[in-house]
Amino acid sequence: MVRRVACLAVIVLAFLAVSAIADNSAKEKAAIIIAEKWLSLVDAEKYAESWKEASELFRNAVKQEQWKQSLQAVRKPLGKLLTRKIKTKTYKTSLPGAPDGEYVVIQFGTSFENKKEAIETVTPMMDKDGKWRVSG
């Protein structure tokens, strides 16, 4: 009897672990879609629109004009985007300096016209309205 209960407990724990992994995988996929759409705005130099599409946390931390000026200064010297591929993606519920919540930290290996190897880190978060938005 004890052996059956122990086996059942192991099966339940394994099921819960697989379920959590699958849930995080779905969240990572949703966050990646948002990150790529957001980066396409940045690539198209639609900086004001990228600011508007960012999370509330992001918009409260950075003024729109400041964001536009920063991106113009940083992105222009890089030239046109050549390639971008996901290197890593990690689901987190806590990040340094940010409120607890749901985040996916995504690193892209990126190549630009004037910078052959770059790492871009984009962190979508689940915003208050239940939608994924870029927070940093």
Residue ranges and their predicted role:
Residues 17-46:
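Short, low-complexity N-terminal intrinsically disordered segments enriched in polar/charged residues
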Residues 32-34, 48-101:
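Short solvent-exposed beta->alpha transition segments
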Residues 88-136:
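Exposed beta-sheet edge and beta->alpha loop/turn motif
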Residues 8-17:
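Bacterial N-terminal signal peptides
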Residues 1-8:
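Bacterial N-terminal signal peptides that target proteins for export
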Residues 23-25, 36-40, 53-60, 110-111:
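Second-shell loop/turn segments in exported
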